[in-house]
Regions:
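Short, basic/hydrophobic alpha-helical segments
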Residues: 66-76, 172, 197-214
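Structured beta-strand-rich core segments of catalytic domains in phosphoester-bond hydrolases
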Residues: 82-174
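Metal-dependent phosphoester-hydrolase catalytic domains
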Residues: 1-25, 90, 206-220, 227-318
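Active-site-proximal beta-strand elements of phosphoester/diester hydrolases
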Residues: 35-48, 135, 177-187
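N-terminal, active-site-proximal structural segment of metallo-dependent hydrolase catalytic domains
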Residues: 1-104, 108-121, 198, 289-292, ...
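Metal-dependent phosphoester/phosphodiester hydrolase catalytic core
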Residues: 52, 85, 173-200
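Extracytoplasmic/secreted cell-surface and envelope-processing proteins
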Residues: 49, 90-93, 115-118, 189-192, ...
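Catalytic metal-binding/acid-base residues of hydrolase active sites
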Residues: 44, 87, 184-186, 225-228
Length: 318
């Protein structure tokens, strides 16, 4: 059974129409040969799907056909989306790709085994009408000698740092080639205890960005960095190599629940190693703009849409 939007109940169609109006008012338009819209979205437990227009209390998972159509309408507003929390069962992803249509493609990692991996994948979804693959797709392993430079780093540092293996893919838009590196960093309860490890990882990312730049490839990192705002030592370590987080992304909440000191999702790059021109970014605050007639709590909404907002950035590509 597949989702057929034409058979959706009237209230679902009206809800989707309202969402599309909101998205048009919130996001810049996708323009061929003029811009590229990049998004990082941690979609909570993006795996199974209940094939009903509205899931009930006894249903599992809670994400239903109406919810997935909302997610797809958001996805199609971007050119490239880095998605986190794609589960081992990726029925939602398969159905989303079918709904997006033949102009869209995706790449994803294998499931990361182990408790911290949480049976999840990382994925990139992209619009083939504007975006082309340019040859590179790899899971990242940071060399041991990068960690051994600092004796304060423990032998199991990488296992603790990455819940899922970082994933890098190169894309071409117009005359610009760039690498997107998506990762999920774990810092544990005391982020200051991992400062040396984060410094080593930041140093390695900078070196790789410089290497990419020597081939006229820009590199953008995006994903769940799990950082603290302000003067937190891990944030300072990560930024110490020149990694740039756009100031206009700073004030935006990253999750639907509340503003906090955490800096979960990020889009960042090295200013000297990028050929794209940043033109602004933000979040898609879908609260109140999806599933409007259901009166869900935020917790209930998080299992149907997500607990994270889509974080986006527009780059000009003239």
């Amino acid at each position: 059974m597949n989702i057929d939007p034409s058979t959706a109940p009237k209230e679902v169609k009206e809800d989707l129409k309202n969402l599309q109006t909101f998205l048009s008012q919130t996001l810049p338009a996708k323009k061929l040969d003029q811009n590229v819209l990049i998004c990082a979205w941690n979609i909570r437990m993006f795996g199974g799907l209940t094939m009903k227009w509205e899931s009930q209390e006894e249903d599992s998972p809670k994400r239903d056909m109406h919810s997935l159509l909302c997610i797809v309408d958001i996805l199609r507003r971007f050119d490239i989306i880095a998605v986190q929390e794609v589960r081992g069962n990726f029925k939602c992803l398969r159905e989303a790709m079918r709904l997006l249509g033949p102009d869209w493609s995706f790449l994803m990692t294998d499931v990361t085994k182990g408790g911290k991996g949480n049976n999840e994948r990382l994925a990139f979804i992209f619009d083939n009408r504007k975006v082309k693959l340019s040859g590179l797709a790899c899971e990242i392993v940071i060399p041991d000698d990068e960690l051994e430079k600092n004796k304060a780093i423990n032998a199991d540092a990488l296992q603790r740092q990455f819940a899922r293996t970082p994933y890098a893919v190169s894309f071409q838009v117009a005359n610009h080639t760039f690498v997107l590196l998506t990762l999920h960093v774990l810092f544990g309860k005391k982020s200051a205890d991992r400062e040396a490890e984060i410094q080593a990882i930041a140093d390695w990312i900078k070196g790789w960005a410089e290497e990419m730049n020597s081939w006229n490839h820009s590199m953008i990192t995006l994903g769940d960095f799990n950082l603290e705002r302000g003067n937190d030592p891990t944030l300072q370590a990560f930024l110490s190599t020149g990694l740039h987080i756009p100031p206009d992304l700073d004030p935006h909440a990253r999750t639907i629940f509340k503003k906090s000191t955490t800096y979960y999702d990020q889009i960042s790059w090295f200013k000297n190693n990028i050929s794209l021109q940043y033109n602004g970014g933000g979040i898609v605050d879908f609260r109140g703009n999806v599933l409007q007639n259901r009166n869900h709590t935020l917790q209930e909404l998080s299992f149907r849409i997500s607990d994270h907002f889509p974080l986006w950035a527009e780059f000009l590509t003239p």
